[in-house]
Regions:
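Low-complexity, intrinsically disordered terminal/linker segments enriched in charged
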Residues: 160-201
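Solvent-exposed loop/turn segments at secondary-structure junctions
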Residues: 79, 96-97, 122-123, 137, ...
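N-terminal signal peptide c-region/cleavage motif recognized by signal peptidases
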Residues: 15-17
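Short beta-strand edge/turn micro-motifs at domain boundaries
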Residues: 142-170
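Early exported N-terminus immediately downstream of N-terminal targeting peptides
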Residues: 22-102
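Bacterial N-terminal signal peptides that target proteins for export
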Residues: 1-7
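Surface-exposed, charged secondary-structure patches
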Residues: 92, 100-143, 195-201
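Surface-exposed, polar/charged faces of alpha-helical domains
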Residues: 26, 41-52, 81-85, 111-112, ...
Length: 201
């Protein structure tokens, strides 16, 4: 369930890159309706052509999700001895593996999904920002989702999503730490690419 919400919230909240005046909270709030509307309007088309859905998801995630920085945090101490090429390969493989397994779950995102920004908290002298939000669904309890952003040369980019208190980075850090105690990073990356290795929800 975690990954379904992570992908849906990343895509729904972070669809387009921010302009200079956009704060992370404003970006999350402003873009949610537009992307949820697109998913709802093109649901039948995406179901009929999974490749089109995959291309759409990749395009949206690419604009604001800092997959390499996120991958470094997931790898933690294992990133210290890895080359830039190895980290990039791992980041790409992990993202593709998750999209391959859970991308279709985005088709379950309903058009009446909403978002409410509760707070923005600057971190590390303003270099990072935590956005506390809630995903709202009619007749159902709201789901707390926090986004962690880092400021880069390209603007604000998200590197972690925390759904109901469960962090994407911390969840996979624990799983990959266990794997990397017995395998090399290249072996783990290859397993993700080939589909012989999958991470749990």
């Amino acid at each position: 369930m975690l990954i379904r919400f992570v992908l849906a919230s990343l895509l729904a909240g972070l669809a387009l890159s921010a302009t200079a005046q956009d704060t992370p909270g404003a970006l999350v709030e402003a873009r949610t309706k537009a992307v949820v509307s697109t998913l709802a309007a093109q649901r039948a088309e995406f179901r009929a052509d999974p490749a089109k859905l995959s291309a759409y998801v990749r395009e949206q995630l690419e604009t604001l999700f800092d997959r390499e920085y996120s991958a470094r945090l997931v790898l933690a101490r294992h990133a210290r001895s890895a080359s830039e090429a190895q980290i990039t390969a791992f980041a790409d493989a992990l993202t593709e593996n998750l999209l391959r397994r859970y991308g279709d779950a985005l088709l379950e995102v309903e058009g009446d999904l909403g978002v409410r920004i509760r707070a923005e908290t600057p971190l590390r002298d303003g270099k990072m920002m935590r956005v506390n939000s809630e995903i709202t669904r009619p007749g159902q309890p709201s789901v707390p989702i926090d986004y962690l952003f880092a400021r880069s040369a390209d603007g604000w980019r998200v590197f972690d999503v925390i759904v109901e208190g469960v962090s994407y980075v911390q969840t996979y850090r624990a799983q990959f730490d266990a794997l990397l105690r017995t395998r090399t990073l290249d072996e783990v990356t290859r397993g993700l690419v080939e589909g012989t290795l999958s991470v749990d929800e």
